[in-house]
Amino acid sequence: MGSKSFGNLLDLASGDLLDIPQTPRYLPRVMTVPGIISDVDGYGISDGDSDVISLPCRERKIIVANFLPLNGKKDSETGKWKFSLDNDSPLLHLKDGFSPETEVIYVGSLKTHVDVSEQDEVSHNLFEEFNCVATFLPQDVHKKFYLGFCKQQLWPLFHYMLPMCPDHGERFDRGLWQAYVSANKIFADKVMGVINLEEDYIWIHDYHLMVLPTFLRRRFHRVKLGFFLHSPFPSSEIYRTLPVREELLRGLLNCDLIGFHTFDYARHFLSCCCRMLGLEYESKRGHIALDYLGRTVFLKILPIGIHMGRLESVLNLPATAEKLKEIQEKYRGKKIILGVDDMDIFKGLSLKILAFEHLLQQYPSMLGKIVLIQIVNPARGSGKDVQEARKETYDTVKRINERYGSHDYEPVVLIDRPVPRFEKSAYYALAECCIVNAVRDGMNLVPYKYTVCRQGTPSMNKSLGVSDDLPRTSTLVLSEFIGCSPSLSGAIRVNPWDVDAVADSLYSAITMSDFEKQLRHKKHFHYISTHDVGYWARSFSQDLERASRDHYSKRCWGVGWGLGFRLVALSPNFRRLSIEQTVSAYRRSSKRAIFLDYDGTLVPETSIVKDPSAEVISALKALCSDPNNTIFIVSGRGKVSLSEWLAPCENLGIAAEHGYFTRWNKSSDWETSGLSDDLEWKKVVEPIMRLYTETTDGSNIEAKESALVWHHQDADPDFGSCQAKELLDHLETVLVNEPVIVNRGHQIVEVKPQGVSKGLVTGKILSRMLEDGIAPDFVVCIGDDRSDEEMFENISTTLSAQSSSMSTEIFACTVGRKPSKAKYFLDEVSDVVKLLQGLANTSSPKPRYPSHLRVSFESVV
């Protein structure tokens, strides 16, 4: 039995969404039933519908995340739910970066289960009181979605952990993947229920919702959509092991802006797009941009910040002052090294504690003078790996304390319980050094919080009995593998796996001079205070507005099924070439010129066999037999190959090697471009290209009579691209005084004589026709790559300049839906062949058949 396909899960989850009309300007009553989109697009709406709430024309931000920034509990006496804002959630403080007039709506799940019978009431109250739209997932879906696919598959993979065997991680499970898609669909339904397309900007957060953009983009082509990934993004070698890798990549690419904490994470994402989807990227005015089917997808690299005011208000609490005095008295005479981490296999807890043990071994003078206080936050997931990490941590702490401790000295203090925010802040404020030793982490804001607490407040200083003018100090020891490390340049960076080096770094941090500690602290505090969560939200929001600015200037349509859906966006004047209309124009005309590229136009680019098909030869022969037609193949291929492949077409013109050689028909001689025949430069270029070929596996040299081309389509994409840039620079330097042009095309670097291009040769052919009194009133030009763009541009320029009084119908057409100077497109080579057959049938005399046997194929075409 064939395997079941899961590529169309979007359709299964969503039903038919494409036929629903555009969202009107009103906000429907909050929905509570997953999968039902009521009153979003005019269904069941009558005049005076009481359920419809008018919306003012006001900018809104819809923040979508797995969890709402709320805390909730059910009152045991009244049975009523009580909710409050979670001030520890960064999402709650995003509004600090928006203008005061901006309305913020949150969409997400609650952190606690609400019975189905209570969901209607809870939904209504949350929206009315907090502007929150609750997403209720069925319990089985939530378990498979969050604890299953997110925590057992995506989370480990994004942190470079592969399930090499059953004992180390969960293998890919299609059932969990289906739950992930279903959960994302439920989130999409909620967003669709409140979206106001023209005013709203949607900002999606983290790996839990990576296919949500596909649902939204499929439903609303011009939705303004941003995504920020709060976890690492793995290298392509790790990511490519994921069976649903393309679905997730295309999901993110359906956004207008994708955010990452560091360039490393963005670089890995770009590498995946390049290697798996064949996309190219460039830097545009300081912004990294991917060209994706006519849309420009921008990347944003900016680490998140913290809410300074929130943390400072905690430092001013009376409870904090009391805890400060308590800790200060308890550890008087000792320097505190502080760690605050989740109980997680990626946080490097055991490595950190081992490094502290090495510190005590290597520097026995520190015994009794330093203490490592490790606060352990509750684990976010559950499983054998968490239990193993906890056991290893406890065993290591016990061994160290038994060996180095005494009745009044405990070297390692492990606090494994929920620690109130005020207590953590007190430990931050009194710690001489803070160490974050994670082996892999997305951002980690512990160093930020530590630095702000070390800066203190007047109230805290009063509690400690220190002057406000006293210079502040702080020291950070940070793993190289966490997102905040690049931002805090004054930190001591370490490889967490090198336990000895970490121990030495801790010793350096403790014994560092106060002046150096002050300088490092000042540098960090300035960065943290100027890059808070408000700055982060404002910067991302501004870039999202910029990225979605031209949505209404292009024509958009969706292609692909299921989670392979993507949006094509092109110029409003760019449309599919109608074979019927082209044939009609051909029939009306008296003199015609047709210019055709070869590779990618008459023969598929990916085809190993480069000979033209029998259908192509038959159509070309029929077109060439018409004395009113001038047909040319304009190609970068050599004249020998083209002559051999197109030999059956006696009257076919050929412009080989981009027009360096031209032949009007098979019986005529080859003409050169009239340029100098001095090709001595090839003796310089060929050895250089050979050197790059030897050092770039998968590359090769194509030697033409007039040009040399270095191909790297079979090389590693990143390395081949890098080598091509280097080769381009090398050749441009060497050939600066030679009459040649060095071009970089799609996976090639080409050196050819100046004054040779497809645009110039088509212009010369048309000029010759005009000089001979053959003024074409019908011109077709078809190509598929960059070199053909010059043809499209030159044809209209030549005809308008030399025959302004003549009315000529010009059909410039590119193969494939992509940005082009042509006005028309055909999807693939087979469409080009159908067009040529349609034109050929018009030129050729029709055989006489009985009327009842005549069949028209135009409707099929």
UniProtKB/Swiss-Prot annotation:
The modification Phosphoserine is found at residue 5. Its EC number is 2.4.1.15. InterPro entries: Glyco_trans_20 (IPR001830), HAD-like_sf (IPR036412), HAD-SF_hydro_IIB (IPR006379), HAD_sf (IPR023214), Trehalose_PPase (IPR003337). It catalyses: D-glucose 6-phosphate + UDP-alpha-D-glucose = alpha,alpha-trehalose 6-phosphate + UDP + H(+). It comes from Arabidopsis thaliana (Mouse-ear cress). SUPFAM superfamilies: HAD-like (SSF56784), UDP-Glycosyltransferase/glycogen phosphorylase (SSF53756). It comes from the Eukaryota. This is Probable alpha,alpha-trehalose-phosphate synthase [UDP-forming] 10.
